[in-house]
């Protein structure tokens, strides 16, 4: 199965939102009847603002003319430092592959494409929240678990 990665801009907003809802339902184990109307409206506003400003890059993995996965990276700035002189950070989000295509390298292609985008932007740090299912993929690609981070 040949997989290509396509940039997904605002012209694909409907697809982006549909895939975002799929990801949210699976990752958060939400039942089909859970009402995500408000959350999806917020996601729409996010994409409508962030994509044109270059604050988010989204992509789809396509095989046999069908979308089989998706991913994105949120861009942000931090104070420049020796380990990130440009101060550019990326946070991988929404990395997802349809269950029937898992284990075929789709997720790896998505993440590699996003890493290439990050390198093009001279991104000094790339972060992500890894699910148990995804941790081995990220480790294979060179990501390391971080100690010392806290969340409120």
Regions found by a protein language model. Name each.
Residues 1-14:
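Conserved N-terminal entry element of GNAT/NAT acetyltransferase domains
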Residues 24-46:
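Conserved GNAT-fold acetyl-CoA-binding loop/helix
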Residues 45-60, 91:
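A short helix-loop-beta-strand connector motif used in the catalytic cores of GNAT acetyltransferases and
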Residues 60, 66-75, 91, 96:
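Conserved beta-strand in the GNAT
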Residues 78-81, 127-129, 133, 139, ...:
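Conserved catalytic-core motifs of GNAT/GCN5-like acyltransferases
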Residues 83-99, 148:
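Conserved acetyl-CoA binding element of GNAT-fold acetyltransferases
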Residues 101, 105-113:
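Conserved acetyl-CoA pyrophosphate-binding loop and the N-cap/start of the following alpha-helix
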Residues 118-130:
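Conserved GNAT acetyl-CoA-binding A-motif
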């Amino acid at each position: 199965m040949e997989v290509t990665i396509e940039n997904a801009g605002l012209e694909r907003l409907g697809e982006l939102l549909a895939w975002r809802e799929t990801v949210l339902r699976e990752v958060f184990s939400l039942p089909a009847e859970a009402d995500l109307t408000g959350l999806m409206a917020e996601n729409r506003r996010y994409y409508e603002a962030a994509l044109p400003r270059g604050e988010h890059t989204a992509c789809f993995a396509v095989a046999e003319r069908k979308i089989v996965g998706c991913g994105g990276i949120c861009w942000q700035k931090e104070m420049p430092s020796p380990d990130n002189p440009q101060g550019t950070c990326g946070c991988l989000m929404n990395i997802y592959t349809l269950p029937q295509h898992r284990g075929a390298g789709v997720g790896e292609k998505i993440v590699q494409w996003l890493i290439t985008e990050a390198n093009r932007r001279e991104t000094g740090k790339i972060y992500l929240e890894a699910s148990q299912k995804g941790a081995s993929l990220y480790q294979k690609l060179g990501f390391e678990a971080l100690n010392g981070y806290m969340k409120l």
